[in-house]
Amino acid sequence: MPRWIHAFVILVLSLSGGFANAEPGPLKLGVGLFQPDKEKNDATYRPLADYLAKRLGREVKLFTVDTWEGLAKSLANGETDIALMGPWGYVLANHSAGAQVVATILYDGKPEYFAIIVTNPKSGINSIQDLKGKTFAFGDKGSTSGYLIPSYHFQKQGIDPDTFFSKVIYTKHQAIETQVTRGELDAGADYNRNRNAMIEQGLIKAEDSKIIWQSDPLPNDAFAVSADLVTNRALVNQLQAALMAIGAELKQTPNLLPAHYVGFVAKDNSFYKPIRDAGLATGKLAPK
């Protein structure tokens, strides 16, 4: 064998060995804006990112995405690899880009939560029909409880928000609760977990917020992986195992998840069928 060919073969083998032994790049973890601001959100979910990094043996970078719609898009376009996201955001990412859920978060031990409509007790509003001609706020259009589910309920009641309300705005869940309690907004869509958290944190008072409608139980937030990672079964299995172990880990590390979150349970795409059905029924999800 000519000397130059021998040298070339050695070079190729050494490079391929180097690639084989190269450490995997960081995983990008996206989370929605569950807390009032990005800084608090990052501080709340950084322990989860650090825990996953330790369990997976690779760096996990945390990204807070301002909107639920934006979080769904980030998982679809590669800006994030894994995400803790609302049910509607997950369904959007699954429908458009093949993202897959690996686990559902448990809130007070249950994989479910509720969409609600809140008003100020002093408003005199006691039902959805009382909202005619009033101001109303939805969450962003990637929100399950703040947009999809109340929109679906209004549709079933024959209510067109654009004509039924005097004014409709789209804003963050925390802003909806704050403006309702101050009397700056007649009513708005939210979810029970957010209202509970804001009351416990002293951000609003329970006596200033009244629930006038509550949905049927909804599947809780999804921990999902991008379509690119779905085929990496070893990593997906490792990630799922790490999430399943969080419940026990919370005993040693209570700040691993926010208050009331007690771990994860394994779920698949079928668990989110009620959200998908609502998206299809309202025309916000195109049939395949």
What kind of region is each of these model predictions?
Residues 119-139:
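Flexible hinge/capping segments at coil-to-helix
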Residues 99-109:
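A structural signal for short loop-to-beta-strand junctions that line the ligand-binding cleft
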Residues 23-89:
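Extracytoplasmic small-molecule ligand-binding "clamshell" domains
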Residues 135-234:
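Pocket-lining segment of extracytoplasmic ligand-binding domains
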Residues 25-31, 36-47, 218, 227-288:
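An extracytoplasmic/periplasmic, membrane-proximal ligand-sensing/linker region
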Residues 1-8:
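Bacterial N-terminal signal peptides that target proteins for export
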